[in-house]
Amino acid sequence: MFDRKTIAAFIIFAVMTMGGCGSSSSNFLSENDRMIQAMTLEEKVGQLFIIRPEHLNRTVSADYIHYHLTSWDTVLTDEMKDTLSKYPVGGFALFARNLDTHEQVKQFTADLGAACEIPPFMALDEEGGRVRRIGRKFSADVEQIGTMQSIGDTGDPQNAYNAAYTIGGYVKEYGFNLDFAPVADVNTNPDNIVIGDRAFGSDPELVSSMVSAYIDGLHAQGVMATLKHFPGHGDTTNDTHTGYSAVYKTWDEILQVELIPFVDNFDKTEMVMTAHITMPNVTSDDLPATLSHEIMTGKLRDELGYNGVLITDSMEMGAIIQNYPHTEVVIMAIEAGNDIVLLPYDYVASFNAVVDAVK
């Protein structure tokens, strides 16, 4: 359960950060194998998680962080370093409230990276449009990118490339190496409240070409990409951030529309992010796609042939925390086929649960 994720993570990180070193692929894989063999069980388990910095703050409970926190971490304290030494992680996801000043963000990302034995993913949601952590916080200092729908409406993939190139340039400047973008959803439902103008449009072929160009733009700046939200969040009416959401299409129908931008770009992206949507006409278990072995392994891995890194959407979202025990659901996600668990509700408890499950 660890080797596939760890190897994939090391490879994509090396490709994006060490591409000019000139070492052969076989030599790199040999070195990578040695690194994995030298890792402790705890280090391997840590690579399964991307967390928020607040998860390192053990002075407050997970419930407090989720429901009551008003002051978010903007510096790495000695106490947080101590937690990190005991509970290593694969990466961090920062939000607008972790961003204070230009220099603070650069220092914070640098300090988080330096505190990890294994170089971490430094991630954020910077899609452009209404989802932009840095763009919103530092709106006067970075170029503002319009909605993906407005870019899709131009019909020119070069505009998607330009947007991503701009975004990749400034997120890299602030110390990030992974963007949870682009949105590969096809917006086929006019009542969709969570995707809407975050998608490039309702034509799957157009969306696919825009997504491809967007990934190229990020890559040109040395930033990794994430296709989201598999198997497609475009035909929903409810928001998985707040609760249950379902897509009632059959698998054949989804193959003809929603999956086209994903399948077309599997070979370009570093990661695919799952959706917490249920698909009652596809699965027999009625589980959210994130937790469904039928979808994540049976459909995505086996049928569609995706062999890259698979990351969950945030496990703090309503569709998850309202329906499943916080640590049990992490095990379910890993068993379904996910390689990285994003934002577990209680990181330390989840970490310990995985260690215990392996032992």
Predicted features along the sequence, with ranges:
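A substrate-binding/cap region within the structured catalytic cores of diverse enzymes
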Residues: 146-176, 181-215, 219
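Catalytic domains of carbohydrate-active enzymes, especially glycoside hydrolases
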Residues: 78-95, 165-178
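Mature N-terminal segment immediately following signal peptide/propeptide cleavage
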Residues: 31-58, 81, 85
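Sec-dependent signal peptide recognition
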Residues: 3-11
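Second-shell residues forming the walls of enzyme active-site clefts
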Residues: 35-40, 64-79, 98-120, 130-132, ...
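C-terminal motif of bacterial Sec signal peptides marking the signal peptidase cleavage site
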Residues: 17-20
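Short glycine-enriched loops at secondary-structure junctions
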Residues: 54-55, 124-132, 136-137, 177-187, ...
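Bacterial signal peptide processing site
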Residues: 22-24
